[in-house]
A protein has these predicted regions:
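Hydrophobic core segments of alpha-helical transmembrane domains in multi-pass membrane transport
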Residues: 32, 88-90, 128-133, 197, ...
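Entry/N-cap segments of selected transmembrane alpha helices
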Residues: 14-18, 75, 79, 189-194
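Alpha-helical multi-pass transmembrane bundles of energy-transducing inner-membrane proteins
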Residues: 20-27, 33-121, 207-238
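Physicochemical signature of membrane-embedded alpha-helices that form the seven-helix bundle of GPCRs
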Residues: 24, 77, 128, 193-199
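Juxtamembrane/interfacial segments at transmembrane-helix boundaries in multi-pass membrane proteins
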Residues: 2-13, 84-145, 170-192, 238
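Functional transmembrane alpha-helices
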Residues: 40-56, 137-177, 191-238
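Helix-loop-helix module between adjacent transmembrane segments
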Residues: 1-39, 131-135, 162, 166
């Protein structure tokens, strides 16, 4: 009876913080799934932007002054990154349009027409996508939101950010790298990915040593892991 009463009266509405947490958590799982199944780079961008919006209330869950500062930093830095990623996505579409090809963001079409894509626009698009999605991944030096967000959010939220949000952004970057490889621009992409990955690993290694907060240590560990992933695809293969 007690369980039925909770359901009838609306547990999520009577316990607002927990209700918001559960709703945002479910929204995050949905948007993360959309990122994984999307084969359209525009829809992929929308889904990654949605992950930012639904995870922000999770960082603010404790409702302290420090958590609201961390949330605003997460949003502002994330929005700058996602805006640059949008410009990069437009550049990929224009790389096809500039050569008289159909203007498309479907990954399969871009891969099929990759050799005919405009190389300058493709390179510009990849640079913007690397900076944009690299910000969401937390690659150094665009990682500034991570220590505060991980440190002030509940532990489970930090795990979701480390294992979910950053992985979604990495998937988007890997798909952009696929287009570069198909277009014969793998060397150009690797020249950007390798130093970025190494720098991220170095920064994380330097800053994690002085940390005493385990959640901030997780943040710098995530920076290092994202650097390893960038280094991995830069060395070869996506």
């Amino acid at each position: 009876p007690a369980v039925r009463t909770d359901i009838q009266e609306g547990f999520l509405f009577r316990n607002e913080p927990e209700g918001v947490f559960v709703a945002c958590l479910l929204g995050f799982l949905a948007t993360m799934s959309l990122v994984c199944v999307s084969s359209h780079l525009g829809l992929l961008w929308v889904a990654i932007e949605a992950t930012t919006l639904v995870t922000a209330p999770l960082i603010y869950f404790n409702r302290t002054q420090q958590s609201i500062e961390a949330t605003w930093k997460y949003l502002l830095v994330g929005f700058v990154g996602i805006a640059l990623a949008l410009l990069g996505t437009f550049c990929l579409a224009y790389a096809a349009l500039h050569q008289g090809l159909p203007c498309t963001l479907v990954l399969g079409d871009l891969l099929a027409h990759a050799p005919q894509l405009s190389k300058p626009w493709l390179r510009a698009g990849f640079v913007l996508l690397l900076v944009g999605y690299g910000t969401k991944m937390g690659l150094a030096p665009m990682h500034t939101w991570k220590p505060d967000a991980y440190g002030e959010a509940p532990g489970v939220v930090g795990a979701l950010l480390a294992g979910g949000v950053t992985s979604c952004a990495f998937l988007a970057l890997a798909r952009a790298y696929q287009v570069c490889v198909a277009a014969g621009e793998s060397a150009f992409a690797s020249r950007l990915l390798l130093p970025t990955g190494l720098f991220s690993m170095a920064v994380a290694g330097l800053f994690v040593v002085g940390q005493r907060d385990f959640k901030r240590m997780l943040a710098y560990s995530s920076v290092e892991h994202m650097g390893i992933l960038a280094l991995g695809i830069g060395i070869g293969g996506a």
